[in-house]
């Protein structure tokens, strides 16, 4: 028993129990096209750690044992893993709903030009992070021109049906800088 388990038992008088697994979140690596100051995994373009296909096969084995579970792919920029598309297709073949957490600007990187079409054709759900709704704040946190590229990507995703069709949800995650929310 680890220290966390001991502390939980001291407070609750029993261990933690879980209900059925509904979502499996999988981090495909720390490679990212951005260098965000607020990144909790410290992903950057300089990082080289990525999930291998061998490890992805273990993920597929786990996912197969959990039919109906949503698989949430994250990173870094998960799209930059060279096995990203093969994993998405394998998960869909198993009948899983696939959700990808994207920074939007990755679609402008070399080799990523058709990624939005790839995702839309497969009905992959998207969760897009945008640290603010103001261009200055986004560019300060993520780099010059990131806000404009993000908006361009959102328009492209909308043109493919994302955020417009029930089968192609596009959720935006707002990341405030600090312990506060924007004014109402």
Where do the language-model regions lie?
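Conserved alpha-helical substructure of the radical SAM core
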Residues: 1-75, 79-96
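Amphipathic, soluble alpha/beta structural segments
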Residues: 10, 147, 155-156, 178-181
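Core AdoMet radical
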Residues: 23, 43-51, 66-81, 92-111, ...
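Short acidic, gly/pro-rich beta-turn/loop elements at beta-sheet edges
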Residues: 36, 110, 138, 180-182
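Alpha-helix termini
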Residues: 158-165
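Hydrophobic, aromatic-enriched interface-forming segments
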Residues: 167-184
């Amino acid at each position: 028993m680890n220290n966390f388990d001991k502390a939980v038992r001291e407070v609750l008088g029993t261990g933690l129990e879980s209900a059925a697994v509904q979502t499996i979140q999988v981090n495909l690596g720390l490679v990212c096209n951005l260098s965000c100051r607020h990144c909790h995994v410290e992903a950057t373009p300089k990082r080289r750690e990525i999930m291998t296909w061998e490890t992805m096969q273990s993920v597929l084995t786990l996912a197969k044992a959990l039919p109906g579970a949503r698989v949430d792919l994250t990173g870094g920029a998960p799209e930059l893993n060279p096995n990203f598309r093969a994993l998405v297709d394998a998960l869909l073949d198993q009948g899983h709903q696939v959700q990808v957490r994207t920074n939007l600007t990755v679609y402008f990187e070399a080799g990523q030009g058709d990624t939005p079409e790839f995702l839309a054709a497969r009905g992959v759900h998207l969760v897009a992070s945008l640290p603010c709704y103001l261009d200055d704040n986004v560019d300060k946190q993520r780099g010059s021109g990131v806000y404009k590229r993000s908006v361009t990507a959102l328009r492209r995703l909308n043109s493919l049906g994302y955020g417009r069709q029930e089968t192609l949800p596009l959720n935006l995650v707002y990341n405030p800088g600090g312990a506060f929310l924007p004014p109402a």
